[in-house]
Amino acid sequence: ELKRHLLDQHSHLYCPLADGLSYLPNGIELVGASTQPLWHASLWVADDLLIMQKLDGQYCLTAASLCSPSSWHLAQKIGHSMARIHDPVPSLHQKLTPKIDRFFDHLMVEKPIQRFNWSLQANTNLAQFPEDKIIHPASTALYYRCERQTLTRLPQTNAIAFTIRVYVYPMMSLTQVPDALTQLKAAIDAMPKAVASYKEIIYFAPALQKYFSD
């Protein structure tokens, strides 16, 4: 399915190989073993690929190819339920996890869902890990991290494919987007303290003032 989609919709970028695809801009051959289909597919797209399946009444993360985590380790999440995975997120486990499971139950094959998430970081690295956390001085340059996430029900297995594509922008670039900094400040000001702490807003606050005061 993915191979056919890339060849149909992005034929200017890909051409077929017997066991994979060739990426035309640089000639790289993207091949993989048929016994590892998720790894095979992950070579073809920039998105991280995660698979969730319903086990014993709960959706669990059962497989993944992850290159750009947002302050978490795959080894600590794989095999666990959504409730366990989201436990560190303030208010989410208690209030939203049951709703997330119900939402997944109603996800239809022909209607994939797209959503976006954001955070701040102190460098351009796509991969962010919990141990990278530091207190950021006011002079530190900031970057806006945006995740484009999709959820798709797979027709044959009924599992859910969760994709994450990460983009990182210098905070200064938001000045070119009308009202972007104003809306970001409003979102931060309205954020519960626990969520602001989880997103490390407290550490970025001195540096943020430079952008919000201009």
Predicted regions and their residues:
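Extended, well-ordered protein cores
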Residues: 1-214
